[in-house]
Amino acid sequence: MPTVNQLVRQGRTMNKTKTKSPALMSCPQRRGVCTRVYTTTPKKPNSALRKVARVKLTSKVEVTAYIPGVGHNLQEHSIVLVRGGRVKDLPGVRYHIIRGALDASGVENRKQGRSLYGVKRPKAAK
């Protein structure tokens, strides 16, 4: 426990909170170019082939970003919009690609939860 004199001289320091998505540099999203699009396997106990991409952001940082949804049209040199948000069973993946923005198309035939996957409202069937 510090003395009053120590507190007068030094004061108390606040703990700085560390950001979970440093590559975005305090921006909500960043644009980037895909350098590699590939699949990877999740940690135990899950099993799948998760679609991910290495993206070089405009902030000159290269990150691994998850491609959500069923099917995608991304390839090398595709321009994408990246947001924060990790994937729990993929170590090192701390970003998501935004579907329906720039070169990333929306998910085909999606009817529910469309806003997260860049899908317009379907025309009402008569």
Curated annotation (Swiss-Prot):
Keyword Ribonucleoprotein: yes
Keyword Ribonucleoprotein: yes
Biased composition (Polar residues): 1-16
CDD domains from the UniProt entry: Ribosomal_S12 (cd03368)
Keywords: Methylation, Ribonucleoprotein, Ribosomal protein, RNA-binding, rRNA-binding, tRNA-binding
Region (Disordered): 1-24
GO cellular component: small ribosomal subunit
Gene3D superfamilies: Nucleic acid-binding proteins (2.40.50.140)
GO MF, any single term: rRNA binding
Superkingdom, natural source: Bacteria
Any single GO BP term: translation
Modification sites for 3-methylthioaspartic acid: 89
Sequence similarity: Belongs to the universal ribosomal protein uS12 family.
Complexes and interactors: Part of the 30S ribosomal subunit. Contacts proteins S8 and S17. May interact with IF1 in the 30S initiation complex.
Protein name per UniProt: Small ribosomal subunit protein uS12
Originating organism: Elusimicrobium minutum (strain Pei191)
